């Protein structure tokens, strides 16, 4: 049975209005996106730029075009040499929560969920090493006890999720935790032991979480081990070199990072992989960690690809 002419006209009109609305939203998203990234280049107006990029309201519009930009950018990135080891200083969870009117614990949870997304993107691009800075030794002494306890609970949940995650086992991802584990509560240690044991035989990808981590402490531990071995005669003085020190670090069984990314606009290293990142390329973005998008990751990789690595020369 044919529909009445009036209903056909109405359907066509609604379809046209829907198309115009989608075009308008797409234009608005692209404009906001371009404006945000342009503003971030100018230090004097970082405040409004950061709000645009990190606002959960603005981001809901921007994200509609972000996927399109990510696909185009990914095509370019995948056609060039990729970093083999990406390290990330995941910063900005608490500021994201504050700007969004949320409790700090919810900001940390949003950061956990973002890490799961980023792992997907890294696996998709076949980048074999991903290392993230989750908790420093300074955080343990400087954070309030209730926030630390909430973080510890989140780490237990995250590690347990990883141990059961189909992506981990399907992609042969070895999960490791580096840091002063003796500073962590028993429930976190149990979760670490379980997850590391379940993934210890995997070797296609390595995902390292730095917990209770401090690079100076790591180097001190390595030096102490070398000194002890030299004292008992098992290590000759002439054998002490960069390779000997590197292999004694908590991260000694993996290559140095090629690219170190830090979110939230802070431009400092914060005692993270000091020895290992001597020749790494650094990329800083004003985006808070929970707002970090696939496009942000791809832009970091593209910036890395556009640099000429000199390795100290």
PLM feature spans:
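Flexible, compositionally biased loop and terminal segments
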Residues: 2-11, 15, 19-313
């Amino acid at each position: 049975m044919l529909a009445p002419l009036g209903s056909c006209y109405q359907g066509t009109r609604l379809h046209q209005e829907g198309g115009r609305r989608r075009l308008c939203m797409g234009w608005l998203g692209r404009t906001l996106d371009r404006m945000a990234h342009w503003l971030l280049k100018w230090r004097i107006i970082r405040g409004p730029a950061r709000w645009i990029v990190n606002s959960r309201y603005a981001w809901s519009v921007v994200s509609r075009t972000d996927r399109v930009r990510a696909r185009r950018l990914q095509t370019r990135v995948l056609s060039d040499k990729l970093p083999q080891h990406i390290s990330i200083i995941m910063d900005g969870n608490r500021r994201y929560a504050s700007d969004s009117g949320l409790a700090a614990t919810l900001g940390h949870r949003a950061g956990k969920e973002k890490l799961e997304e980023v792992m997907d993107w890294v696996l998709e691009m076949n980048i074999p090493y991903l290392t993230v800075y989750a908790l420093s030794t300074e955080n343990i002494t400087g954070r309030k006890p209730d926030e630390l306890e909430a973080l510890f609970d989140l780490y237990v949940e995250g590690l347990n999720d990883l141990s059961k995650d189909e992506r981990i086992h399907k992609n042969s991802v070895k999960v490791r935790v580096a840091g002063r584990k003796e500073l962590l509560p028993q429930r976190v240690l149990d979760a670490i032991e379980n997850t590391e044991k379940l993934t210890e035989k995997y070797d296609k990808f390595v995902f390292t979480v730095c917990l209770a981590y401090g690079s100076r402490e790591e180097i001190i531990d390595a030096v102490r081990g070398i000194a002890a071995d030299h004292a008992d005669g098992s290590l000759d003085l002439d054998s002490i070199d960069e390779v000997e020190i590197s292999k004694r670090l908590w991260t000694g069984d993996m290559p140095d990072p090629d690219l170190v990314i830090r979110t939230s606009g802070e431009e400092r290293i914060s005692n993270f992989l000091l020895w290992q990142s001597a020749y790494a390329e650094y990329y800083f973005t004003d985006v808070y960690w929970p707002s970090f998008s696939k496009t942000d990751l791809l832009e970091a990789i593209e910036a890395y690809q556009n640099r000429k690595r000199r390795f100290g020369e």
